[in-house]
C-alpha cells in the first residue's frame, strides 16, 4: 500500500524463529528489535525501512496473526506466486479479500492509518499495550 510506512511479511507458524533470526542477523543488512510478542519479529533494514514479520497460524476455520496489542483474523487462503519488481513472492490467491479484511478499503489512501484502530478484523490481546499505544498517539 502506497501509504503504508513499513513492510509486512507473513510466514507460517512452523517457521523456526531461531533459524530465521540467525539468517537475518548473519546477512549484516538488518537490525533485529527486541521481541515484545512471540507472534512478530520486527527488523529494520540498513536503509531505514521497518519490516514486521508475522507468524501466521492456522485454526480450523480461520488463519490469524498477531502483534503485541492485537490479533487479526483472516479467511483461510491459498498462496500463489506473484511477480513484483523483478522478484517472485507468495501472496494470498484472493489478495483483495485478504487486504480488505486487514485494511478495510485498502484502495483508498489513508495517510494516518493506525493498525491498532483502523483494522476491521482485529481483536485485542493485550489491553495494557493498547493503552500505551493510545497514550502515545495523544502525545505525538
Named regions from a protein language model:
Residues 103-107, 127-128:
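Acidic, metal-coordinating catalytic segment for phosphate/diphosphate chemistry
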Residues 7-11, 91, 99:
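Long, contiguous hydrophobic alpha-helical segments, chiefly transmembrane helices and signal peptides
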Residues 95-96, 103:
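C-terminal catalytic-base region of ester-bond hydrolases, centering on the histidine
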Residues 21-23, 101-103:
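Short active-site loop/helix that positions an aromatic residue
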Amino acid at each position: 500500500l502506497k501509504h503504508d510506512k513499513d513492510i509486512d511479511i507473513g510466514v507460517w507458524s512452523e517457521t523456526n524463529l531461531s533459524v530465521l533470526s540467525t539468517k537475518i542477523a548473519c546477512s549484516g543488512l538488518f537490525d533485529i528489535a527486541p521481541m515484545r510478542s512471540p507472534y512478530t519479529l520486527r527488523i529494520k533494514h540498513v536503509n531505514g525501512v521497518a519490516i514486521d514479520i508475522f507468524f501466521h497460524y492456522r485454526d480450523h476455520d480461520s488463519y490469524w496473526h498477531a502483534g503485541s496489542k492485537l490479533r487479526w483474523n483472516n479467511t483461510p487462503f491459498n498462496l500463489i506466486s506473484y511477480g513484483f519488481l523483478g522478484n517472485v513472492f507468495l501472496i494470498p490467491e484472493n489478495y483483495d479479500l485478504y487486504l480488505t479484511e486487514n485494511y478495510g478499503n485498502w484502495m483508498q489512501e489513508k495517510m494516518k492509518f493506525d493498525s491498532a484502530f483502523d483494522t476491521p478484523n482485529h481483536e485485542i490481546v493485550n489491553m495494557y499495550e493498547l493503552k500505551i499505544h493510545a497514550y502515545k498517539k495523544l502525545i505525538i
